[in-house]
């Protein structure tokens, strides 16, 4: 039985759950542009106020995946997405993007799904452009990039065209809604493994269980207790891990891996060019907090990708990838490969 938008709104006002099939129906209306902007705004705000459930988020992500332009990847082994929800307000350089190069250099395949900066001074798309990467690729070109270089960047607007039907509503509302947490759940290449950073501690347990429902294989959802949507050097990090169908939640500390706890203040940047400079310094093996946090996050991603047996092993592989120059070489490789498709 379908639900009308008005009934769904009433449900959110009463703090009652919208069931799976109902949420599928509502989300399809939104993605097709068949729901009025007023009703769409009211429902997504109502969901936020009552707090979205795991079931509601999983259903919404299922529909977003349905409407996406998919990237077909033949070999799913050691295939990982490194992504953050953003919105953590930390204004750091692009740690997950830097980690992509290290993770690929150490033997994983990385499908990075990202956008321009919204809350940050530099989104993943902005810094990749500053590096010289052509981000405007078709789905088959992204697939070729993953096969050839071990990395592919999927610029979100190219892969989620239906999002234009809710873009104006989201912009005018100006508050976080369910759509802020759907991006990391809707990788167009369907990477079965993931390192996902989130902007709130409550989302660690929620997002990892959403990924469990969506059939993911090995996922680590992380929240740095200093507010970062990354594995942090400045505080303990909360982890929700999905492996072999089971969820475990725990805390990790930099000292667990022989790293020094140090403030993330030195990682702040004002724009994409500053982010590019800091990233290249880390990949060039210049001793810095930037290098250490990239090593930590890439090591965690290598564990998520099942290249490493543990985060500690992953960190060792990441160190070797940076020290050998392989990680830095991956930047030039991605630039060269993507520029051939420049239109």
UniProtKB/Swiss-Prot annotation:
Enumerate the InterPro entries for this protein: Anthranilate_Pribosyl_Tfrase, Glycosyl_Trfase_fam3, Glycosyl_Trfase_fam3_N_dom, Glycosyl_Trfase_fam3_N_dom_sf, Nuc_phospho_transferase
Record-linked Pfam families = Glycos_trans_3N (PF02885), Glycos_transf_3 (PF00591)
Q: Which residues bind anthranilate 2?
A: 170
Highest taxon, organism lineage:
Bacteria
Catalytically driven reaction(s): N-(5-phospho-beta-D-ribosyl)anthranilate + diphosphate = 5-phospho-alpha-D-ribose 1-diphosphate + anthranilate
Query: What are the TM regions of this chain, as residue ranges?
Result: none
Q: What is its EC number?
A: 2.4.2.18
**Note accompanying the cofactor annotation:** Binds 2 magnesium ions per monomer.
Which residues are listed for Mg(2+) 2 binding in this entry?
A: 229-230
Q: Name one GO cellular component term.
A: cytosol
Q: In which pathway does it act?
A: Amino-acid biosynthesis; L-tryptophan biosynthesis; L-tryptophan from chorismate: step 2/5
- One record GO biological process: L-tryptophan biosynthetic process
One example of the protein's molecular function in GO is: anthranilate phosphoribosyltransferase activity
Q: Which cofactor does it need?
A: Mg(2+)
Which residues are in coiled coils? none
Which key words are in the record?
Answer: Amino-acid biosynthesis, Aromatic amino acid biosynthesis, Glycosyltransferase, Magnesium, Metal-binding, Transferase, Tryptophan biosynthesis
Give the binding site residues for anthranilate 1.
84, 115
Could you say which residues bind Mg(2+) 1 here?
Answer: 96, 230
Q: Where does 5-phospho-alpha-D-ribose 1-diphosphate bind?
A: 84, 87-88, 92, 94-97, 112-120, 124
Assembly: Homodimer.
Q: Which family does it belong to?
A: Belongs to the anthranilate phosphoribosyltransferase family.
User: What does this protein's UniProt record list under function?
Assistant: Catalyzes the transfer of the phosphoribosyl group of 5-phosphorylribose-1-pyrophosphate (PRPP) to anthranilate to yield N-(5'-phosphoribosyl)-anthranilate (PRA).
Tell me the protein's name: Anthranilate phosphoribosyltransferase
